Amino acid sequence: MGKKRIVFFACLLLFTVLLRFSYAGITTESPLSVEQTLSSSNGIYELGFFSPNNSQNLYVGIWFKGIIPRVVVWVANRETPTTDTSANLAISSNGSLLLFNGKHGVVWSIGENFASNGSRAELTDNGNLVVIDNASGRTLWESFEHFGDTMLPFSSLMYNLATGEKRVLTSWKTDTDPSPGVFVGQITPQVPSQVLIMRGSTRYYRTGPWAKTRFTGIPLMDDTYASPFSLQQDANGSGFFTYFDRSFKLSRIIISSEGSMKRFRHNGTDWELSYMAPANSCDIYGVCGPFGLCIVSVPLKCKCLKGFVPHSTEEWKRGNWTGGCARLTELHCQGNSTGKDVNIFHPVTNVKLPDFYEYESSVDAEECHQSCLHNCSCLAFAYIHGIGCLIWNQNLMDAVQFSAGGEILSIRLAHSELGGNKRNKIIVASTVSLSLFVILTSAAFGFWRYRVKHKAYTLKDAWRNDLKSKEVPGLEFFEMNTIQTATNNFSLSNKLGQGGFGSVYKGKLQDGKEIAVKQLSSSSGQGKEEFMNEIVLISKLQHRNLVRVLGCCIEGEEKLLIYEFMLNKSLDTFVFDARKKLEVDWPKRFDIVQGIARGLLYLHRDSRLKVIHRDLKVSNILLDEKMNPKISDFGLARMYEGTQCQDKTRRVVGTLGYMSPEYAWTGVFSEKSDIYSFGVLLLEIIIGEKISRFSYGEEGKTLLAYAWESWGETKGIDLLDQDLADSCRPLEVGRCVQIGLLCVQHQPADRPNTLELLAMLTTTSDLPSPKQPTFVVHSRDDESSLSKDLFTVNEMTQSMILGR
């Protein structure tokens, strides 16, 4: 009897422990009490009640499970704590999530009611508390849209100017008081955006504008920086700044009660501080005032920009620099064409760019300079890699000079600042000489215009004759004015993206037909042979998974290809986008993968001549209105007849990361070269990361190395982007990972051919075990290219080829 009693109490204790630590979900019938917690399925996060610093106040929060001391990452009722130990968190009858106080009713709620037949609250594996509709599975509310002081991986700061919605970080009042503090972290609606910390209504710290993968005001974020961030801004006035960190299982970004933005990563034992800002006195906003330059040193040093002097010498002597500087010589600006009053620009290097910049779109560096020069309100400009042209029409505020890194800021000065007040030399020319010069110049210009126009017509006729000799049926020749009208003169609003050899624009012909226009840039390296190759090849290849060319336009040196318009653009706009990736769930991705394989099979086997694409990658897969994939960009493709199965070139073309070892190293390409590229593409689609940007762990594992390691540990099932976990079929995902690894094996003979590849994707037959890939390339640049003696990127020498 005694033993039975012991067993009974042991079972009761176990039940209590399981109830305490393994609560499954919150529903109307199953509220969460003070003694219970709700865990994420991966065991990383936990939701429950806590009391900071052993106070009497009770808060509902999320923290890292099993980490001591406890690190709270989100608080529900941060402004309304309760002291009632009978409080509980529950789903109301109208589907809302409420915190009930046993004595005083509702203490906190999500503030929304839903027309729902039932809902539940769950804690996801990325620490997001979600309220889900039971019937549809739709997310009704999520904590990631209602920040506290912490960002977790896959969460986003955002703004929407149309709706006024913002997601910001708000500090705790103190380290032990979760109520809102005075510091707020947000992204600004400028283009490009920057992260800004406000102290009440005053600017406290800013990162500088975002430049593709880095913040320009953080010198540690150089071109080699593996950025865990992503910024998307659109023309409708909204922006999303998303935090990714795949290199560490546990990581977070917080805004502390003292106003510091900190990034922590857990090494398995302790939290490591990997970044903190403000990091020095110069990081404090506007410490040197307008037109002042803060020099990063100990102690802090302020100086005025060239051409400026302290606004108040006495204040500067006392160490109060916030009054800033005033211009020494006033500007005289009347178009800045000629004359002694012409303004000049003085470059300042290693600078954190000032605040209140404005973005000038679609201009190069020289046009940026001229735009500022001819705008009398423009005080400075900068042309930044990854951004383009920025100009300043307001006081230059919060400029910092680093010992290394930073950007070049060109500030506007009076011409006299260049070399003192020396008198300018005056060049006097006689009226007769000037008149003669004008006459000769006009005559020369007229003759040049005639030669250019004549050459343009001659070139156009030569191109037409060459294409006609290739017997390209159904190929239409478009006039330039037709394409200019269709694309609104190649306006920026019509630009769809950047292709392998130039820009791509959306157009609409007079009959209402939508087209895509590929404008080949003069610097692309694609000459007549490559252009002819792409026209002839695509026009003769017909398959539902290949893009269709409608015609071309040749006007002088201008070469345009006109394609059928793909409504959903390219696959990379979905797979690598933090928001749009959710529109392409796993079943749809698997369909896309099979479609690409079918298109590749046609190129390799089913057309009369074998076609090797040589530049197969995610950005070259276009999607129609039904999300059907179509392989595009055939400028680098090669064809050969009969039994020939490989070729060799001295000029290797393609994109770094997608190129097979034998092709990149020796110039040998074959069907197996495209198979290698397909394997990389398949793994990118599964993981949701670009190979050129992927880096995992302290060793900086490449995407292929990471996939190989994952396949060895879990057969690759954990590789799928976690945001797609609900839609995945684990065995199918694991099989695709194995197929991807089979495709990227070092030896071409070990890789499947295209027929075998499609069979692997469409059947459940046994697969061989892959061998470890050895050719792994690590690059920080998007779609970087090789350029060595053996390699020439986006250039090629090839013979004219004919398709079927």
From Swiss-Prot:
Stretches assigned to the EGF-like domain: 278-314
PROSITE patterns xrefs: BULB_LECTIN (PS50927), PAN (PS50948), PROTEIN_KINASE_ATP (PS00107), PROTEIN_KINASE_DOM (PS50011), PROTEIN_KINASE_ST (PS00108)
Molecular-function GO term, any one: carbohydrate binding
One GO cellular component term: plasma membrane
Membrane topology recorded in Swiss-Prot or TrEMBL: Single-pass type I membrane protein
Residues with PTM Phosphothreonine: 649
Domain of life the protein comes from: Eukaryota
Topological domains annotated Cytoplasmic: 447-804
GO biological process, one term: recognition of pollen
EC main group: transferase
Positions with a binding annotation for ATP: 496-504, 518
Residues with PTM Phosphoserine: 524, 539, 619, 632, 692
Residue ranges occupied by any Bulb-type lectin domain in the UniProt entry: 25-144
Subcellular location(s) of the protein: Cell membrane
Keyword Transmembrane: yes
Domain PAN intervals: 333-415
Residues exposed to the Extracellular side: 25-425
Glycosylation sites: 53, 94, 117, 134, 236, 267, 320, 336, 375
Residues covered by region (CaM-binding): 579-596
Family: Belongs to the protein kinase superfamily. Ser/Thr protein kinase family.
Name under which the protein is recorded: G-type lectin S-receptor-like serine/threonine-protein kinase At1g61490
Organism: Arabidopsis thaliana (Mouse-ear cress)
Lineage of the organism: Eukaryota, Viridiplantae, Streptophyta, Embryophyta, Tracheophyta
